[in-house]
């Protein structure tokens, strides 16, 4: 029989091996997976550019209810090498499609208390329309494709694992095809 002290945590799950970053300075792409609170100002600082006339920032925060059940906190897990690869593809596609001058995608892992941010999306572009569209599109694609799993923990003691893509931007259930 072994105790929890005898077992070693795999490196990809060990909070001591974080933060995980991926940066592409040629396209001003900044990606992060971290157990620490997310910093909105840091994200804005990274995308700031003299060529940018628009900076858009989105913070996804933990709310206190889900379908009339009181939520105590959320918890997120991921496989960082795969998740960062997916996020890099999303960021590169957004830069190319919308002509962005910068993009940050940062996601928190582990426990995220009520009112704290679990995701930061920050984008900059020459004009507002491209930035608005890119910010929303990046968020929706991250929820659909990024290998990040969420556990909702309820005040009544229950919990449920969810895929981010189970709900649309208005919180309505999405039917996911198995094909």
Swiss-Prot record:
GO MF annotations, alphabetized: molybdopterin synthase activity
GO biological process, one term: Mo-molybdopterin cofactor biosynthetic process
Record field: compositional bias (Polar residues): 1-10
Cross-referenced Pfam families: MoaE
Keywords: Cytoplasm, Molybdenum cofactor biosynthesis, Transferase
Family statement: Belongs to the MoaE family. MOCS2B subfamily.
Protein name as it appears in the record: Molybdopterin synthase catalytic subunit
């Amino acid at each position: 029989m072994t105790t929890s002290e005898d077992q070693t945590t795999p490196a990809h799950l060990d909070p001591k091996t974080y933060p995980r970053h991926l940066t592409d300075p040629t396209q001003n792409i900044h990606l992060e997976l971290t157990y620490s609170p997310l910093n909105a100002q840091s994200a804005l600082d990274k995308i700031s550019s003299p060529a940018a006339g628009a900076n858009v920032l989105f913070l996804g925060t933990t709310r206190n209810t889900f379908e009339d059940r009181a939520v105590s906190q959320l918890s997120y897990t991921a496989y960082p090498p795969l998740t960062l690869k997916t996020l890099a593809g999303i960021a590169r596609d957004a830069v190319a499609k919308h002509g962005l001058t910068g993009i940050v995608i940062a996601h928190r892992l582990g426990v995220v208390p009520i009112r704290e941010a679990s995701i930061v999306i920050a984008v900059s572009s020459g004009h507002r329309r491209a930035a608005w569209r890119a910010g929303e599109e990046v968020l929706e694609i991250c929820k659909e494709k990024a290998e990040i799993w969420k556990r909702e923990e309820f005040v009544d003691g229950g919990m449920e694992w969810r895929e981010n893509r189970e709900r649309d931007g208005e919180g309505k259930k999405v039917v996911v095809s198995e094909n």
